Amino acid sequence: MENKQIFFTGVHKAELLENEVGQVKENEVLTKMEYTVISGGTERACLLGMNNTSKKYPMSLGYCGIGYVEAVGSKVNKVSVGDRVLVYHGCHSKYNIRPENDITKVENNDVSSLEAAFVIIASMGLGGVRKLEIELGESAMVMGQGLLGIFATQFLRLSGAYPVIAVDLNAQRRELALKLGADYALDPSDKNFVQTVKNITNGKGVNGCVEVTGISQA
């Protein structure tokens, strides 16, 4: 079976290449992908050949997406052919073969595939929020309102944090954060940034902060 898959074949170079789908082993699941999600941090770093990557080309990337089960191995019992499933560590390709443990059936038919495709990457934002152990009514800040940050902002709102302060240099991201649950959205380059945070929190500062800017200096 022919497959099409995105590979990074060099710095600044991505190609859609053809390869063959392998044989499904006894504990594996073959899925035909509907959506895969681009991780801005990982994919960008690899495409630019940054120092925190292997720089070994060609490389295939991708770790979250959704599709439908095409075939299962003889020992697979959690999913069946035709099931809509989340695929962890699946690549940006038409077909993926992954171990059963990397496959999760989507039980809720009211959730669209496009929405469900983000569950895996959203869970990373949730992980940051859970580590804070924020209590009801405690203040929290999210530094960076990219994909992970905007999810963390929403999870803090759902966790009962107040106020939720979103921080980003980009005005459009700050506006989106306010629409999705932030009580305040601040520009960290504002000379009054620190004082504004103190004013919002009655001089105490925030109880917890999730830092997802992707910038080491932050």
Regions found by a protein language model. Give the residues of each.
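Residue-level recognition of beta-strand termini and adjacent short loop/turns
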Residues: G10-H12, K25
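A structural motif shared across PLP-dependent enzymes of the aminotransferase-like
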Residues: H89-E100
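Glycine/charged-rich beta-loop-alpha catalytic/anionic-binding loops adjacent to active sites
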Residues: D102-L114, I200, K204
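Mid-domain Rossmann-like dinucleotide-binding core that forms the NAD(H)/NADP(H) cofactor-binding site
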Residues: E115-D190, Q195
